[in-house]
A protein has these predicted regions:
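Signal peptide processing junction and immediate N-terminal pro/mature segment
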Residues: 19-26
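Positively charged n-region of N-terminal signal peptides that target proteins for export
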Residues: 1-4
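Primary mode marks residue(s) on the alpha4-beta5-alpha5 output face of response regulator receiver
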Residues: 27-65, 69-186, 193-280
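Bacterial N-terminal signal peptides
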Residues: 9-17
Length: 280
């Protein structure tokens, strides 16, 4: 009898070991910083319109702001709300991307130049899983008052990834080649305080992740947005921004996505550690 109990006990122990090993193998590996490289989904949008409006900084005050170039939602103006934006159409290719994005308008020798197109990367920068931006969320990245170079982790100019011209805080002179025309990049923070949809300064509810982690006072990881405007010009010293000089780059984001679409993309692309790109 005792030998049978011993055999049964050994069998149970082996079974528990197999189950534990199988469960461990089936569990997705915890991500590391290297695993986050290339995890994204991408928006492709064309230019919509220009206006001296800013529904985040100057809501309900048309004509008060410096001039902005808008992509995404086609109805964005000083009076925009979540409801009006949700009712609008979009210049973005993906159905449901009715969010509003804007930057200061580029000037070439004093003449306004519209962006040819915009690419919006939604990336994962944190080891912790992400939450989608809540509906109506607003934020600004970059400093519209800057008169000296901002950190290039926030904003920079370049001539495209394939160009040999290095990225810089000042406007470069790009080759006279459509594939290497001037670009302006602005990178948004990806850590939220988890409470406020906006703040008086439009920035303090957000923080940048450091080595894959959010700070304790901004504990909620959200997608890291990179907004890139492409211009059909080569750049050079004649380029300025409507907010002043070459260093005052900044960008605004107003979340008016169809929320179900955004939540789905965050879940099946960013939290699943997939490179969805534009085809998602």
């Amino acid at each position: 009898m005792r030998s049978w109990l011993t055999v049964i006990g050994l069998a149970v122990a082996v079974w528990i070991s197999i189950v534990a090993h199988t469960s461990e193998a089936a569990r997705p590996a915890a991500p590391n910083l290297r695993a986050l490289q290339g995890v994204n989904f991408i928006g492709s949008c064309t230019f919509s319109h220009m206006a001296m409006d800013d529904p985040i900084v100057y809501p309900g005050q048309p004509g008060v702001s410096h001039d902005h170039s808008f992509v995404g939602n086609t109805t964005t103006n000083a009076f925009s709300t979540l409801r009006t934006l949700r009712a609008g159409s979009t210049t973005c290719k993906r159905n449901g991307e009715t969010a509003a994005y804007w930057m200061p308008t580029l000037l070439l020798n004093g003449q306004m130049v519209a962006p040819r197109s915009a690419t919006i990367y939604y990336r994962r920068k944190t080891l912790a899983p992400l939450k989608a931006f809540p509906a109506g969320f607003k934020m600004i990245a970059g400093d519209r008052h800057a008169t000296t170079p901002q950190g290039m982790q926030i904003t920079y100019w370049n001539c495209g990834a394939a160009s040999t011209v290095p990225a810089s805080s000042a406007v470069p002179t790009c080759p006279n080649d459509r594939g290497q025309s001037l670009r302006l990049h602005v990178n948004f923070p990806s850590c939220w305080d988890g409470q406020r949809l906006d703040t008086a300064d439009h920035v303090s509810h957000m923080a940048y992740a450091v080595r894959g982690a959010c700070p304790a006072d901004h504990p909620v990881a959200v997608p890291a947005i990179s907004l890139i405007f492409r211009y059909a010009i080569t750049g050079g010293s004649g380029v300025t921004l409507s907010s002043g000089g070459q260093y005052s780059a900044h960008a605004d984001f107003f979340n008016a996505w169809r929320q179900g679409t955004l939540v789905s993309l965050v879940g099946r692309c960013l939290n699943a550690l997939r490179h969805c790109g534009r085809d998602s």
